[in-house]
From Swiss-Prot:
One of its GO terms (biological process) is tricarboxylic acid cycle. Substrate binds at residues 97-99, 125, 128-131, 138-140, 186, 318, 323-325. This is Fumarate hydratase class II. It comes from the Bacteria. CDD domains: Fumarase_classII. Pathway: Carbohydrate metabolism; tricarboxylic acid cycle; (S)-malate from fumarate: step 1/1. It catalyses: (S)-malate = fumarate + H2O.
Length: 461
């Protein structure tokens, strides 16, 4: 392998000649060969956008010559466009401030900008990773900013569209199924009737609340630490830089980023991400309940509840011919379990900041973005391959309604709880219908039973 010599404050180090990264990236590769969990692509993209915005603002403020600024901007645009993916090899398990990933971006952009200016990569480069690309910045404000930019982008561009699509599907099903009366269940036991549409309206409402929770978390995440530099005081950042770079990022992304009103909070804590991940966890809890309900209601086809039919997407067994399983529900509940685990990690990370800097940042970012990606992809898959194809089994639903003992609840206002309970117990013990048991006990006449026990009048209409 051909190498070139790069230097940092620790001295010279050999770097692969065909790579754009520099000394600090190479040292990180040597010192943190752990697990292979690379920094998420969303975070790399956010770092590139930050460097682009900073170069533009530093030029406007007279701190960076136009030729260098334009070269850094062009290099950052290449990264944003998906070029040079192999130049960001660092793992999550590194310094807790994300310094090495910040320097990875600085080095790559410095070397690439130098090439764009007609220079070389390496020690003779025309653009310096610290003095030019990282001007007016510190890893301590860059990395928290990248986390917020990546999180807001993931939520608004990927998660919320998937959430809305699934919510709208369930809301349509609620309308389509509104005339289907079914038996309710509490404690996994028969309860009073409701409509299948009412049941699905509950699912849609859960997702509507999650959408509200996520939107409520966004303003905190839109506050950016950039301009706080090392500890939040803004040392070495010029006046106006923080406000201008936030505005530049807002224009670049189309998202409402602003400078944080208190950069000590934004750098020392990860409360915005902890709060937002709580909304992701709540969404995962809702999706687990919805996916579980649907697979239980579709259980069978002959020996289960069988109230719903779901799409048959693939064979379900390597030994039982013809078996089809609720695989989308299974995938959904598994990924939601992973989100619950990620939430624990994010909470521990958020609680573990000391003094002026949280140093669990790469781990928090990794788990947050993992959760957002899982939920976005999981909801899209569940919607496309399950929810849109759900159909009611009307005959089975009607059969279970007629067999339910809990229709006796309609008699409570007329003959009282105790007599109604006697009717239900007698019917259950003797295997008869409620009507037969009620008439045998003499508590009601046939006409009264038929007038009072009417499922269509028991669903709140």
């Amino acid at each position: 392998m051909t190498t070139r010599t790069e230097r940092d404050t620790f001295g010279p180090i050999e770097v692969p000649a065909d790579r754009l990264w520099g000394a600090q990236t190479q040292r990180s590769l040597q010192n943190f060969d752990i697990a292979g969990d690379r920094m998420p692509r969303e975070l790399i993209d956010a770092l590139a956008r930050i460097k682009r915005a900073s170069a533009a603002v530093n030029q406007r403020l007279g701190l960076l010559p136009a030729d260098k600024a334009n070269a850094v901007i062009a290099a950052a645009d290449e990264v944003i466009a998906g070029k040079h993916p192999g130049e960001f090899p660092l793992v999550v398990w590194q310094t807790g401030s994300g310094t090495q990933s910040n320097m990875n971006m600085n080095e790559v952009l410095a070397n690439r900008a130098s090439e764009l200016l007609g220079g070389e990569r390496g020690e003779a480069r025309l653009v310096h990773p610290n003095d030019d690309v990282n001007r007016s910045q510190s890893s301590n404000d860059v990395f928290p900013t990248a986390m917020h930019v990546a999180a807001v982008t993931a939520i608004t561009r990927h998660l919320l569209p998937s959430l809305r699509a699934l919510r709208e599907t369930l809301a349509r099903k609620a309308i389509d199924f509104d005339d289907i009366i079914k038996i309710g269940r509490t404690h996994l036991q028969d309860a009073t009737p409701l409509t299948l549409g009412q049941e699905f309206s509950g699912y849609a409402a859960q997702l509507q609340h999650s959408e509200t929770h996520l939107n409520a978390a966004l303003p905190h995440l839109c506050e950016l630490a950039l301009g706080g530099t090392a500890v939040g005081t803004g040392l070495n950042a010029p006046a106006g830089y923080a406000e201008q770079v936030a505005a530049e990022l807002a224009a670049l992304t189309g998202l409402p980023f602003v400078t944080s009103p208190n950069k000590f909070e934004t750098m020392a804590s990860a409360d915005g991400l902890v709060h937002a991940h709580g909304a992701l966890k709540t969404l995962a809890a809702s999706l687990t309940k919805i996916a579980n309900d649907i697979r239980w209601l579709a259980s069978g086809p002959r020996s289960g509840l069988g109230e719903l039919s779901i799409p048959e997407n693939e064979p379900g067994s390597s030994i039982m011919p013809g078996k089809v399983n609720p695989t989308q529900s299974e995938a959904m509940t598994m990924l939601c379990a992973q989100v619950f685990g990620n939430d624990v990690a994010v909470n521990i990370g958020g609680a573990s900041g000391n003094f002026e800097l949280n140093v669990f940042r790469p781990m928090i970012a990794y788990n947050f973005l993992h959760s957002a990606r899982l939920l976005a992809d999981g909801m899209r898959s569940f919607n496309d391959h399950c929810a849109v194809g759900i159909e009611p089994n009307r005959e089975r639903i009607a059969e279970l309604v007629q067999r339910s003992l809990m229709l006796v609840t309609a008699l409570n206002p007329h003959i009282g709880y105790d007599k109604s309970a006697q009717i239900a117990k007698k019917a259950h013990k003797e295997g008869t219908s409620l009507r037969e048991a009620a008439l045998a006990l003499g508590y009601v006449t046939a006409e009264q039973f038929d007038a009072w026990v009417r499922p269509e009048q028991m669903v709140g209409r």
